[in-house]
Amino acid sequence: MRAAALALLFPLMAHAIDVQGHRGARGLLPENTLPAFARALELGVTTLELDTGVTRDRVVVVHHDRRLNPDTARGPDGRWIDAPGPAIHSLSFEELQRYDVGRLRPGSAYAKRFPHQQPLDGVRIPALKDLFSLAEKDKAIRFNIETKISPEAPHETLPPG
């Protein structure tokens, strides 16, 4: 009897579980990138979790930190950037697109944490609108969006409002 009741309830419980793709599928592909979000959708997540910043020219972009991360970003010359990386709000969207965020710096704590992440050279930080375009095929997908605008770090973000 108990097993039968659980069998009847399981389909209802499955719809109640929110499976989030944290920064896309960052254990598999470069975090907060369109390929990572596409993989998360392929895997059947119900919510895409992401972080946003705003560039100098007011483009909302998908990126976890208020600054480019030296463990995930390489400059136009292909070299890893130095810490601290430039603040997202100090760059135009065009300038931001010069940075490659498709792999983890070898030997970094990030690389050790995600040893199975597949590198993808040439991957850029996406605009939020591009993520919405990617996800629009799945009408049931939800978003968990954290903004990286902070009154506690006015030198690193645009002002709230």
Tell me the role of every PLM-derived stretch.
Residues 3-13:
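Sec-dependent N-terminal signal peptides
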Residues 12-161:
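Phosphate-group recognition and catalysis centered on beta-loop-alpha active-site segments
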